[in-house]
């Protein structure tokens, strides 16, 4: 954790025209209010199978979102869309470090080991509904104002797990996204 200190003016008055009273010393690791933040949205289209998924199946394996910085921040929203119109519900698991001990194989049973729980940001349940005009097949769900903190190593990881039985329309049917805010490095 960084630190900062304020060096105050000691003894004496400020000369006319001076616009500085002391100075601030900031350690490179400090997170300061008003520091530059990065806001953004990342969307990924993982490859899935055009075959039946059942409840508990991982969809698309372990999905990676490469962040622009390695700074910590907030996940602001999480979204899932199916271009072909799947209306199942899904659970989304987010991790701020690679959950290397768990199993993330597309169309296989999702399992997470206890050692990876500390890396998990959260789990979100999403129920997919039509998101476009009548006649368009796209379905999706987003949780906004999520505001879940993360400590980024440069990548946020996601697993999408089916909670029902359905068949995606194509191998590129699913889109996943996050919006985020990251502090200065």
Question: What is each model feature region?
Answer:
Residues 2, 7, 12, 35-36, ...:
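Intrinsically disordered, low-complexity segments enriched in Ser/Pro/Gly/Ala and basic residues
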Residues 112-148:
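Extended, solvent-exposed segments with strong compositional bias
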Residues 83-123:
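Surface-exposed turn/loop modules enriched in turn-prone residues
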Residues 1-62, 67-83, 161, 165-185:
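Extended, low-complexity segments enriched in Ser/Thr/Gly and acidic residues that occur primarily
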Residues 24, 133-167, 174:
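Cysteine-clustered segments with highest specificity for TGF-beta superfamily mature ligands
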